[in-house]
Amino acid sequence: GILDTFIPKEWAEANGTTPDAVDGYLALQTLNKVFEYNCTGSKVYDNCWDFVAEDTHALFMDIDSEVVGKNFLYMLTEDKYAAMLKDAFNALPADEQAYFQPTIDEMESEANDLGLGADGKYALAWIKLWVGSYNAQTDDGPICNTLVSDSATDQCGLLVYSKLRSVEESAGVSVNNIKVAAYQDGYKGIGGYGYCHYLFVTDNSPLPWTACAFIAYMTCTEDGFSAWGKDMGGYSANPEVAAAIEETYQHSKGGYNEAGEDQFPCKDDRGYDWWTTD
């Protein structure tokens, strides 16, 4: 191919391995897209099936606009995530289960034909309902701007978490007009998804060692990663850099004001480990 993978020695060591033993590509960072909902009304989204419920149209970057959105849906068919969807379904009240059950039953033969696991029908049902109901948008920025408005009562979306960093508080706009669904006590099911940014060296690079040095700078030093790390929702794939970034920027208390009060709780970034563990 035209892209080569370079694994910096320090990056590999920080991850408890060696460059030769790394199987895959060099990740710069993981970003996450999370379910959020406007909380100016009385509607609560406490289960991932709520985002595909009747008459719900979540704001979402169209799957033909960004490949990671399509990949997210494919990932849901993996046994681990299909089981999470099944468990979330089982936690629903009976009347809500009754709405989804026909679609789940309809997808059983499809799941078998595709060779999916025992819970594959739950994944396919969620995917079908999502694709058939979401409100397609061109970018996550406008989605965020819509949801934080006090006129977006009960609306919801799946969008890049870090977009909350740029919300400017005003009379009709506030970060406190939304909630991050997975941060709420008792939430069931998937809270969103993560995706990586990878770094490569091109085969035709006139200065490949310079490219490698720059890659090492971005992935192995706090200063090099700070272009992304200064903002919430971007997690370095180097655990040493990630720890240094948190020490400097304190994203876990991103919603705190100068008086030490938690003014915007949804901006308290819980971090990579929280998002990637059950």
Regions found by a protein language model. Give the residues of each.
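Short, intrinsically disordered, charge-balanced linker/junction segments flanking boundaries
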Residues: 1, 52, 270-278
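Extracytoplasmic ligand-binding site segments that recognize negatively charged/polar headgroups
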Residues: 1-142
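Sec-exported extracytoplasmic/periplasmic mature domains
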Residues: 2, 56-57, 77-81, 132, ...
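Residues that flank catalytic or metal-binding motifs in active/ligand-binding sites
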Residues: 29-31, 72, 194-197, 210
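Solvent-exposed loop/turn segments at secondary-structure junctions
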Residues: 33, 40-43, 64-69, 161-165, ...
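Short, hydrophobic alpha-helical packing/hinge segments within bilobed ligand-binding/sensory domains
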Residues: 48, 143-146, 211, 224
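Extracytoplasmic/periplasmic substrate-binding proteins
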Residues: 122-124, 132-204
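Mature extracytoplasmic/periplasmic domains
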Residues: 197-275
